[in-house]
Each structure stands twice: as C-alpha cells, then as structure tokens.
C-alpha cells in the first residue's frame, strides 16, 4: 500500500480550511459588527415610532361613524394606514388623502391587505368627494392618538400599524406620498 504524500495531504488540508474560512468569514464579520453596535441604516421614508406602541394592547378605542369600534386586530393579517388630519382639513389635506388612497390601489392584488382609517373631524365634503369609498371614518374619543395628530391647519399625518396593533411607522405632516407608497410596497408583499 502506498503512503500518502505529506505535501499533497497538507495542500488538501489548506484547501479545506480555505473553503471553511470563505463560509465562516461573513458570519464572524456580522457578529463583530453587531457586538460593536453597528446596524445598517434603513431606507424607510417613515419615522420609527419610539417608544413602541401597541394600540390593541392599550385598547385604544376608535369609534366609527356607523357606531362600531375599530378592531385593531383584523380577522386576516392586514395593516392599517391611519390618516390623522389637522384642524380644518381642506384642499391640501384632501389631496394628500387622495394620494394615500391611491398608494393603496398601487398594491394591486395586495390592496385588500391594507385598511384605511381616517381619524378626526372629516372634511365637509367627504361624502361628495368619494372619500368614504376608500376610508373608514372614526373618532378618537379618548385622545390616545393625539400625540400623532398634526397641529398645522389643512395638513395630514399618517401612521402605519401592523396587523397586531403595533405602530410601525409615523409620517409627519408634509411627508412625501410617493415615499409612503414605496414603504407600503416593501411591507405588503
């Protein structure tokens, strides 16, 4: 029987170690970066809601115009996009609300996975403009959503809420509806 060549044996071991290193290096690098506290920056257009809020756990009641109370946890997994209007929702406010509803439509077959909720005093011409075709209208009787409402007249803030009632992203007045649409397309697939 032939004895293995020591040089060939060392070369085989080096190749095996090199292959193991190729697969282990990214894992080790990720662990080092995580322990150092580095996290990749996201490209979301909305702001993170800090401290995290769960409206279902807090039992935030939103009274709908038909007398029902908004169910934060839907029967099927559905996110909720809440529009919170400032005082005197008029032309600019309605324009943003229309763009938000259009962002839902761009989700195509995933559009039913997003619910639209308008909280606050509805515009005077809400029914005439067809707003009620897309938005559920409600009131925050306890003022639990007041910290998210704008104070600027004729403006809208938006809040994206997960299907379990956890507030995910906040979009302050003057936000870009196109950025909101992009975020929705990332989250709802």
Question: Where on the chain are the PLM-derived regions?
Answer:
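Hydrophobic membrane-insertion alpha-helices, especially the h-region
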Residues: 14-36
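Structural microenvironment flanking redox-active thiols in thiol-disulfide oxidoreductases
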Residues: 91-131
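N-terminal Lys/Arg-rich, disordered targeting/topogenic segments
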Residues: 1-10
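Short active-site neighborhood of thiol/selenol oxidoreductases, capturing the structured segment around
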Residues: 72-100
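Thiol-/selenol-based redox modules, centered on thioredoxin-like
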Residues: 154, 160-189
């Amino acid at each position: 029987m032939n004895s293995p060549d020591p040089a060939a044996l060392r070369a085989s071991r080096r190749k095996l170690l090199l292959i193991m290193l190729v697969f282990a290096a990214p894992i080790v690098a990720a662990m080092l970066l995580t322990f150092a506290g580095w996290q990749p920056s996201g490209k979301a257009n909305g702001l993170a809601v800090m401290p995290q809020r769960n409206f279902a756990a807090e039992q935030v009641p939103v009274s709908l115009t038909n007398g029902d109370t908004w169910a934060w946890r839907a029967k099927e997994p559905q996110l909720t996009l809440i529009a919170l209007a400032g005082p005197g929702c008029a032309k600019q406010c309605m324009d943003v609300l229309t763009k938000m509803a259009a962002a839902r439509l761009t989700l195509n077959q995933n559009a039913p996975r997003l619910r639209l909720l308008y909280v606050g005093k509805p515009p005077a011409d809400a029914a005439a403009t067809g707003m009620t075709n897309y938005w559920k209208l409600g009131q925050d009787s306890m003022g639990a959503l007041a910290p998210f409402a704008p104070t600027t007249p004729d403006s809208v803030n938006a809040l994206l809420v997960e299907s379990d009632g956890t507030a995910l992203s906040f979009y302050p007045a003057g936000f870009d509806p196109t950025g909101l649409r992009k975020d929705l397309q990332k989250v709802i697939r």
